[in-house]
Amino acid sequence: MPFKHGTILSIFPVLVMILAALCATAEGSNSGAVRGTVTDPSGAVIPNATVHLINQVSGLDRTATTDATGQFVFANIPFNPYRMTVLANGFTPMSKSFEIRSVVGANLSMVLQVAGSSQTVTVESTGDLVETDPTFHTDVDRELFTKVPLESESSSLSSLVTLSTPGVSADSNGLFHGLGDHASNSFSVDGQSITDQQSKVFSNQIPADSIQSIEVISGAPPAEYGGKTSLVIVATTRSGQGITKPTGSISSSYGSFGSATGGFDLAYGNAKWGNFIEADGLNSGRFLDPPEFTVFHDKGNEQNVFDRVDYSLTPADSIHLDMNYSRSWFQTPNSFDNLNVQNVETTGPNNGSSSSPDFVNVGNTDQRSKIETINISPTYTRIIGSDSVFNLGGFVRRDDYNYFPSGNALADLGPSNLQTSSISQYRTLTNAAVHSDYSYVRGMHNLKIGAQYGQTFLRENDSLGVVESTYNSPCMNAATGNPLPGYASPSACPGGVVIPNTNYLPVLAPYDLTRGGSVYKFSGHTDVKELGLYIEDQIKADNWLFNLGLRGDVYNGLTSATQTEPRVGIAYNIKPTTTVLRVSYARTLETPFNENLVLSSTGCSNAVLSPLLNCTSGVSGTLQPGFRNEFHAGLQQAFGKHLVFSGEYIWKYTHNAFDFSVLGNTPITFPIDWHNSKIPGYALRADVPQVHGFSAYLVASSVAARFFPPQVAGAGATVGQAGLPFRIDHDEKFNQTTHLQYTLSRGKALNGLWGGFNWRYDSGQVAGATPCYGVTDANTPCGNSSTTLGGQPAIAMVDTNIPPTINPVTHASVALPLTADEEFQAGFACNGVKATPTTPLPAVCLASQFTSSLINIPAPNAGDNDHNPQRIAPRDLFDASIGKDNIFHADRYKVNLDLTAINVTDKHALYNFLSTFSGTHYVTPRALTAKITLNF
């Protein structure tokens, strides 16, 4: 679909500002260089001076030595405040604080005084712990996060964001929910924007070993960021520039579940060029988070190669190139329900189309996935004088996703509420874009102007066949209305007790594998075009800082939208009390998720797929972008030199709020739109910078993810159609992470001994499929399961997430029952008797006797979809690491040894239960890993 003349005119004010400054066509680099010269009072240069650069909060710690001309350079320094200390023989040490807020970087002149009787350090400014910045964010450098115990090697970047950032609700398989939204997060890696989902069931993440530092923006997004902005993770990769001696490491680890890793990295270069390369591999018996605490059919492996090249063509011109290839292969974890699957015999006289089909053991479910990701991102940079920098870059990123069914498709049969069809999928997602930005820093102004044009090429190829013999039965029992297995068509129903099924769908008959059918093949494609233009100026006036920005977005895919988006923020630094007050506002255009976007937008107009979806009359098939207003207010407060606190209140209103639904009862998920969402909440962070080897931080948040029906776009959904607000399944009342870290630096034997400790508390996400009792609340979540037993309130063991069907004979409402194993997974018990994988609870249990060890169930008549839904039980998880750096006390080749324990107490806990989007998942059981690293 081409861009229209009116589309460009609608964002003309922004376009004029861009074209006025740029002659070419979003994000620039995420870092700048710190350059400087060290001299004495007469102006003579001082060679061999030691220059030390630190950020106490993020943990960045770098050291350089001045050359023969007294100059030094720190390349690839993320945007942040820093303190620099210079030491030289015969001179008084000097310390200076400054900030990097632009790719222009900083050029410092450090004048050392000749040493006299006093050796007092000269300090030109203070206030390292607080930032006069209107945007709430979290900074973490590699020096800090390498000692944080992380749960998953295959999604360690997600684990790092979850454990270090307030406002993040942890989910399974590397998925995290930022500030109440499903996955509206984006990564900016060295200026390249990645807005597609990075959960390891969708894509391969950039390897954590390639990351130097991250900044997670939780506040109102600056104008340069678009697409998905609930959380913006700004990542700066490692560089070899300026490292004149080959430096790197070789590592290997082994741990629980047979998990083994191996990897190496190497950095080398000089003042003009540099190269950093890393490669790593993982093989694990627990690759994904399974639906059982016991692990089986959960093997997986992953390989990563990342290379960064920096080269200075001239003192003013340089190029930068990122290249990455990742591949993962993994099994879909099985539950006990997936073992020894019973299904119809497809051959012989008693086959699935006969009047009396035989049921046989068709084996275990064996579904698998393979994902390949390739990424190439070059950038050209030109320094224009001492106050301007121009960047021009591009990137291509491609995900190839394959989902493979079991060798015997009939073995893919799962519980009726989870999987009734066998599927295969080959889906590709290719992003290609060019971007440019111009930065100018002079006086009180820090100006940035930029643009990005990109296209996303989506190709979806799905194959589907029904494997449940009663899903589309031609015949039913005349007395009960229950569908019957067997019979090829309604004309084969003999009459009497067996009559034609009035709910039979002839359009599905050719694709019923239990009756000799074949798979249905769906193919869809589209090209999504996006243009983003922005201008922003950071104005510093005494103790004030003003962020003034304007962004224009054009989205043109299966639908089109334009949006002009003001982004503004104000911060004020009360220096006597080291307090920073801030407020900010952003208008954003939230782009639809690309995963299975074509299927979601066209499924209800497809004759075969439409019956599998809960398509609602009046709902637009095509997903629309979301339009959001968000407001933030917060403060940052330093307490002395060893504690800094940040807090933020957030309020977001989104029109067309995104969620996910599922194709029938299959593993294929896709995005949908609800009418709107209202998300208030708060986020807190406290940091204790390193003092005498000890450091700590705490992050905490509470976010209410309130969504409002009706569904307005996409294929069918399963919840929230009562017209009243509900909490989305990733809503969580409260979560927090406390991290403690200590490093010894005394004595030869103890020097380099360190320990790290995490305490993670989650109050629990919504578990809407859990049966409960409630008949008095109009917004009850318990309607499907509320019944009576002997005149007393009782609960039916059914999935309350899935709307009931109407029995064609009795006209009774029929909900899908839970299996014995599903009840066991949820820790259900009736009158103290627990369910087992093979022994279910009674079909109906008195409400007063129904309990769960893993889910909080509302008291009878106390449940409410908005104010008191069913939730996963709160959990406390403890992780610890201990290690020894340079265990052999060597000078060149240093060996590190460390041991990590995840879930030290072996806590049995769930991430979620029968989530519409992802099913049931347990947290990791106790897992021990030993790692050895050779550094050189």
Question: What do the predicted segments below correspond to?
Answer:
Residues 2-3, 12-136, 193:
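Periplasm-facing N-terminal accessory domains of Gram-negative outer-membrane beta-barrel systems
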Residues 91-113, 117-222, 232, 236-240, ...:
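Periplasmic N-terminal accessory/gating domains of Gram-negative outer-membrane beta-barrel systems
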Residues 254-283, 293-334, 368-391, 566:
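Transmembrane beta-barrel wall of Gram-negative outer-membrane proteins
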Residues 296-298, 316-383, 398-415, 419-427:
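Flexible loop and strand-edge segments within Gram-negative outer membrane beta-barrel domains
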Residues 335-337, 558, 572, 576-630, ...:
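Surface-exposed extracellular loop regions of Gram-negative outer-membrane beta-barrel proteins
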Residues 391-395, 401-403, 573, 614-615, ...:
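Membrane-embedded beta-barrel scaffold of Gram-negative outer-membrane proteins
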Residues 540-545, 649-653, 672-769, 845:
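Gram-negative outer-membrane beta-barrel transporters
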Residues 760-858, 872-877, 884-936:
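C-terminal beta-signal and adjacent terminal beta-strands/loops
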